[in-house]
Regions:
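Extended alpha-helical targeting/anchoring segments
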Residues: 1-237
């Protein structure tokens, strides 16, 4: 990372999932901001919005930082963790640059707000930030061009993006496929897109696996990062 001047990179791993449930059954019972089933390929129940576009305003909510809600003073512990703070700063700086390519008057509206996610293993706290801007005229109707400009998602690649992608391709042992892509819904007035995380996939033999990822910085400790990946392997019911 230091050699390539990468301040933040998001690495993922694949965990085998043992369950009697089918993808369709997991889809039926899951609860999240977005729950999507794609044939026999995957089910995703993501808590993370990528960008929302309404009235020519674009908003993004990069999510970084996870802790078990059962940890004593969990919110304070997460807020006071220097690595988690620096990770959120890095992704906010990068997403401000990303939004500046397609919008003006970019600003951070909220820095490190909490959301609680319920899982079968217990609740977890996650921190996100909110960044917004006013769409440039050339992107107010051409959302396809906008997404082409902004993808892949910064929160699941890294900063700087090109250098992070090169490292990811070199070190990750499995192909992500649809994992860490986006799902877009446009109703004619509001365009919402979601990051495809919290993701159960099926291979060609029908075996299920769970993708999870986490942000790595020069302050990361391997054991803590590995444990965080485990916390993100869950169902919501």
């Amino acid at each position: 990372m230091a050699k390539d001047h990468v301040g933040l990179i998001n690495l993922c791993m694949k965990t085998g999932l043992q369950t009697d449930l089918s993808l369709a059954e997991i889809y039926r019972y899951s609860k999240a901001k977005l729950v999507v089933l794609y044939d026999r390929h995957f089910v995703c129940f993501t808590p993370e919005i990528f960008v929302e576009i309404e009235n020519d305003t674009i908003t993004t909510h990069p999510m970084k930082g996870t802790i078990g809600a059962d940890v004593p003073n969990a919110r304070e512990v997460l807020l006071n963790d220097p690595k988690e703070h620096d990770e959120q700063v890095a992704i906010c700086q990068w997403m401000q640059q990303e939004l500046s390519a397609v919008s003006d008057d970019v600003k951070i509206d909220k820095f490190r707000y909490f959301t609680k996610v319920k899982t079968v293993k217990g609740d977890i706290w996650q921190t996100s930030s909110q960044i917004s801007g006013r769409l440039k005229p050339e992107y107010r109707r051409d959302f396809g061009d906008l997404f082409e400009k902004m993808l892949p998602v910064g929160s699941i690649s890294g900063a700087p993006k090109a250098e992070s992608e090169a490292i990811i391709k070199d070190v990750e042992r499995c192909k992500r496929g649809f994992y860490s892509g986006i799902f877009v819904h446009f109703d004619g007035k509001v365009c919402r897109s979601y990051v495809l995380i919290r993701f159960v996939g099926s291979d060609e033999n029908g075996a299920l696996h769970y993708f999870s990822g986490g942000g790595i910085t020069n302050q990361s400790e391997a054991k803590k990062e590995y444990d965080e990946l485990g916390k993100k392997v869950y169902l919501t019911f």
